[in-house]
Structures are given as structure tokens and as C-alpha cells.
């Protein structure tokens, strides 16, 4: 609809979905072709918020000649957002999924890794263990976790922590692990650069297929066709 197009173009799609109490994982009628832009909306909202948080903390840290205010400030906001995510996911799971307040901690986890990583020193064996653990968790959550578990909440810790493990384990080039070298392959790097674009493009194609075939259960062949079309576009 025009209404949803305007909200998605203004990077407010997630707020519209909250207002409508949309269930992201609902099974039945095809979703809106603009629904997937909730993720881009939250990203833009976070990037608008981040300078407002980091700027004053950096100013104070520079004045004090210490990174403690920056570390402490980001950690506090991270903790508040995580607790909010736990509570909102438990009581209002549908709206919590799209709520930027409960998603901020996921982004700030990356900020905390960037802040603390210069002080993290690992030997190669420890780095290898952490990298394999990170990749194992990342694959496991996509296969083993029930689709009816509420998200984000504590469940979001698994992909966030696994990503942090992989980044931390590859911090020092001379101690790069097998996982780090594999993920540095130029084809995987290229795929990673395209991944979010594919993620956004596949959704309207998926919705079109669901409307065309009058079902939300498209099967493997049509599903792979959607992925290929998403890559080509």
C-alpha cells in the first residue's frame, strides 16, 4: 500500500508494524511486500541514535583522558536495552520483534567489541576454540532452534555472541584461525557484501510468489528460485 511505502521510504516501517501489532512469523495470508524493510528502518534509526550516544561519551573521555566513561556509558545503555528486550519479548513478543529499544543492545554489542578488542589478547589455541565455537553456535541456531521461540529476548544472545566470538578471534592477523581464513575468502566476502541486499530483495519476490500460487507453503524448489532471483537482482 501507499501508506506502507511511505513508512518504509522514511525508515519507519518497524514503527508501523508495531502499531498494527503484526506477527512477523505468522503463517497464513501473505505478508506485505514492504514488511521486510523493518530491518533497514531499525538500522537507520540506530545510526541516527549512535552519534548522540557516542559523541558526548567521547567528549567526556577526551576531557578525562580515559576511555572509562565511554566503556561505562555504552555498557549501561547496552544493559538497559537488553533488559528491556527480555521483558518486552516475554510480555509483548509481536511488537518486541520490531521495537528499536529492544534491539539497540544487539548493535551496541558490536560497539563494545570495537571498544574492548584492543585489550583482549588471545593465544592461537584460544582464538581457534572461540572461532569454532562462534561458527558452531551460528549454524546451530539456524537448524536446531524451534521457530516458535520468541525473539529477540535472550535467544538473540546466541547469534550476537557467536558473531562477537568470530570477530574477536580474528583480531590479530598473525593468530588468524582456520575459520577466520575461510571467512576471508574473497567469494564469501563478496557474498557477505551482497547479503543484506539479497535479504531485502527476496521479500517482495517471496510475497509475489505467495500471491501468485495462493499459498505461503512454496516448497524447496520455489524457495531456491526466490533466493536465486534475489541474488540476480
PLM region descriptions:
Residues 1-233:
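Membrane-interface helix/loop caps of multi-pass membrane proteins
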Amino acid at each position: 500500500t501507499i501508506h506502507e511505502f511511505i513508512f518504509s521510504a522514511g525508515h519507519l516501517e518497524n514503527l508501523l508494524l508495531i502499531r498494527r501489532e503484526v506477527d512477523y512469523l505468522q503463517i497464513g495470508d501473505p505478508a506485505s511486500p514492504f514488511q521486510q524493510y523493518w530491518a533497514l528502518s531499525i538500522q537507520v534509526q540506530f545510526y541516527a541514535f549512535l552519534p548522540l550516544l557516542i559523541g558526548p561519551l567521547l567528549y567526556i573521555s577526551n576531557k578525562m583522558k580515559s576511555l572509562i566513561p565511554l566503556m561505562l556509558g555504552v555498557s549501561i545503555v547496552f544493559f538497559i536495552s537488553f533488559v528491556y528486550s527480555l521483558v518486552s519479548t516475554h510480555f509483548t513478543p509481536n511488537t518486541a520483534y520490531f521495537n528499536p529499544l529492544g534491539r539497540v543492545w544487539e548493535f551496541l554489542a558490536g560497539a563494545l567489541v570495537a571498544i574492548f578488542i584492543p585489550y583482549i589478547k588471545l593465544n592461537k589455541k584460544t582464538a581457534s576454540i572461540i572461532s569454532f565455537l562462534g561458527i558452531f553456535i551460528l549454524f546451530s541456531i539456524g537448524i536446531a532452534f524451534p521457530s516458535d521461540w520468541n525473539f529477540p529476548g535472550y535467544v538473540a544472545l546466541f547469534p550476537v555472541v557467536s558473531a562477537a566470538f568470530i570477530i574477536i578471534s580474528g583480531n590479530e592477523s598473525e593468530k588468524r584461525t582456520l575459520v577466520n581464513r575461510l571467512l576471508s575468502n574473497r567469494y564469501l566476502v563478496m557474498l557477505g557484501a551482497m547479503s543484506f541486499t539479497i535479504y531485502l530483495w527476496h521479500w517482495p519476490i517471496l510475497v509475489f510468489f505467495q500471491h501468485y500460487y495462493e499459498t505461503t507453503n512454496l516448497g524447496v524448489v520455489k524457495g531456491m528460485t526466490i533466493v536465486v532471483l534475489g541474488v540476480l537482482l
